[in-house]
């Protein structure tokens, strides 16, 4: 079957925002006006079409990025809903990775909030073209012009208004379209479906001219001919201006800013027009880079004629279909029943059912093309970030990077039946979410869950209980400490064991030293002249790696260490890889002690937004948690306090802050770096764990 929509008519985009900026409501309205959703789901009633997991409906925050296909003005929109809570930024990164553009939703009353900065930085990292929608213009305190200033001050970006609000707060009734120089005024009776195009109100005429001039000047900077014509007094016509704005968005020269209120159904259709007019198609963004099976860099262009390649960006467990893998097709054509190769894992797979997803109903399809976002049922091996491709033309597309978890909890199933269910459930959850890890504590035998924050783990436990019906006891959250050596040492160790017949013999000399933070573990063999035969070097590495997981201070993983094997001795008969592994293990442990190993603790970047009355209490409380205040500024009438605080002192902070500020202060927290723990903390941790 031939392609139904030309690839230049595709818009693969996401909606990104701070929690509560109205992102899910905006997505809902888009689905409603594009005819895919028959009734509007309200987030605060827990019924939004996109928020389809029970946990999301209760909390009113979006957790999983559902992918939905809709149509507007003959263009095909593939919308990825992204979570706005800081514990789920991994989901945001994952969806930004496969998008061509994004709509950044701001709360007009709050402007740029902490999580907006986080998702904006992630958008910068993946060079995602963006437009900005100032939502909630009907709210008390809504201020479109403050949002423009915030984008400059807090995001360091260049906003260009393409609309101006008509009225604000309860008097907000529409906007001035600066491209057409007309007023769009919403009809009160039509639930937002109808608006009138009118002349610009007289009291806004001067402001409209001023902002129109700024818009045109930003646009003509991108084209010499348009600039020359403009300097001669000729403004670009509507089609040229739209093309120039589109060019500005795609090159990242500026970010068009629109306004509206999704909840009150004003401004959604012009936002859809802007998505179509200004955001890129798959042809407007650079071809994706990959490597072939020989390690050479190759490109895959958005073209049906190129070999098929797709990237798995989300794995979900569906009660009706089983495991669903969401994929972005970067090149070629994919047919159901085709054999593909998972080049990341070197495994063969067969494509079973192919589905197009609307928030949570599905349509079976037989063929999908470059630019499509599809859900594949029945893949057994695929994990998030894997490449699937044509077996005749193998390629591994750019990999996604996932941060290490910083918080962990122990979980104990209550019965044998729960134990079995838990194993299956955890394997599925870990496959769905790469920032969630599962391990077994070697000494206690407990199952340990690791995640990005308290909320992240709360939700995983909730899913275990609800979806998988696992009854379990949950331990108190524990901090993921690390250990690191602080000085360079050279150390030798000889392992000798003689018990009749063949003995064991190996001697090694290691240099152990700290490497740069974030460098991880590095090993280098400096052996010359065969002091340690080549075949025993893997035994040496194995010995080091067996200690890395459990250091000498309190048994935590050792990070940022460089180990060099510089000398050794062996015996023709008694030496073996195992003997060298045993010798190295003992040598490395002693070297870590000699090298003054210290305990590292995760330090979180905390931002508290509080009414001024509570500032003193908040700062005093953060100081008592060993926090270091980095700075304060005003945001509207609230005080914003930035601090670096050890994670171990932040447990239960949400309840403390709530009671301290009568529920009026909010905070966000994300991992920033590891730092050496003070001696008293280290001693306390050693007592508990060593």
From Swiss-Prot:
GO biological process, one term: ribosome disassembly
One of the record's GO cellular component terms: cytoplasm
Annotated InterPro entries: EFG_II, EFG_III, EFG_III/V, EFG_IV, EFG_V, EFG_V-like, EFTu-like_2, G_TR_CS
Binding residues annotated for GTP, in chain numbering: 17-24, 81-85, 135-138
Predominant location: cytoplasm
UniProt-listed Gene3D superfamilies: 3.30.230.10, 3.30.70.240, Elongation Factor G (Translational Gtpase), domain 3 (3.30.70.870), P-loop containing nucleotide triphosphate hydrolases (3.40.50.300), Translation factors (2.40.30.10)
SUPFAM superfamilies with a match to the protein in the record: EF-G C-terminal domain-like, P-loop containing nucleoside triphosphate hydrolases, Ribosomal protein S5 domain 2-like, Translation proteins
GO molecular function, one term: translation elongation factor activity
Keywords, alphabetical: Cytoplasm, Elongation factor, GTP-binding, Nucleotide-binding, Protein biosynthesis
Limits of the tr-type G domain: 8-283
Source organism, top-level taxon: Bacteria
Subcellular localization: Cytoplasm
Similarity annotation: Belongs to the TRAFAC class translation factor GTPase superfamily. Classic translation factor GTPase family. EF-G/EF-2 subfamily.
Role summary: Catalyzes the GTP-dependent ribosomal translocation step during translation elongation. During this step, the ribosome changes from the pre-translocational (PRE) to the post-translocational (POST) state as the newly formed A-site-bound peptidyl-tRNA and P-site-bound deacylated tRNA move to the P and E sites, respectively. Catalyzes the coordinated movement of the two tRNA molecules, the mRNA and conformational changes in the ribosome.
NCBIfam families named in the record: EF-G, PRK12740.1-3, PRK12740.1-5, small_GTP
HAMAP family from the UniProt entry: EF_G_EF_2_B
Protein name as annotated: Elongation factor G
Gene from which this protein is expressed: fusA
